[in-house]
Amino acid sequence: MQRALNSITRFALIPVGIWGMVACGYHFQTAGVIPAGLEPIFIEVFENRTNQAGLETTVTNAVVFEFVKRNEAALARNAADASVVMKGVIRSVELQTISTRGRDVAGERQVTMRIDVQLVAPDGKVKWAAKNLSGQEAYPVSNDKFLNDDRQRVALGTVSTRIAERVYDRLIDNF
């Protein structure tokens, strides 16, 4: 009897769990449909206008990975084979202390990155653009400068991933 009751309870909870996910707006990422005429896309290395060396590689890799993960067929291997080229500019990286550990000693910092992205056709016309996309991530600060630099680099990687997701979502949602 107890075993039957446990099975009934388990099966009753499945629809409740599904309903809870749907009701709260949770949804899985989908590949989505990239508008006609914009495939395949070649992703150029982003321009880095910040003082963060190597950030252009981190951001570009995050965007490429997002496209590979969700719709690898949308990518061209080189610019000559592409319908459009994705060009991006990393506009800024800002650091802000968001908590302290005593007088004038940072306890936690937040890094904010802003980028612009556009899809450009071979004739130079901009087919799509997203300006001022931003993301932020907090990280703990210690007395060790090397550890702080590493934590900042990891935070910038996290922000790059979030912005890459936003770029893809914006592309499939804007049309």
Q: What are the language-model segments listed below?
A:
Residues 1-23:
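Sec-dependent bacterial lipoprotein signal peptides
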Residues 13, 32, 77, 104-106:
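Residues embedded in well-ordered secondary-structure elements
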Residues 22-65, 69-80, 95, 143, ...:
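A structural "domain/chain start" motif
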Residues 51, 55, 107, 151, ...:
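Conserved acidic
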Residues 70-74, 81, 85-130, 136-149, ...:
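Surface-exposed short loop/turn segments
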Residues 149-175:
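Compositionally biased, intrinsically disordered linkers/stalks adjacent to structured regions
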